[in-house]
């Protein structure tokens, strides 16, 4: 899982 803005 990865999250980036």
Curated annotation (Swiss-Prot):
A cellular-component GO term for this protein: extracellular region
What's the domain of life for this entry?
Eukaryota
Q: Which residues carry this modification: Leucine amide?
A: 5
* One of the GO BP terms on file: neuropeptide signaling pathway
Write the record's keywords in alphabetical order, separated by commas: Amidation, Neuropeptide, Secreted
Q: What is its main location?
A: secreted
Localization recorded for this chain is: Secreted
- State the family it belongs to: Belongs to the allatostatin family.
Please give the function described in this protein's UniProt entry. Answer: May act as a neurotransmitter or neuromodulator.
Recorded protein name is Carcinustatin-14
Gene source species: Carcinus maenas
């Amino acid at each position: 899982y990865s999250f980036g803005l």
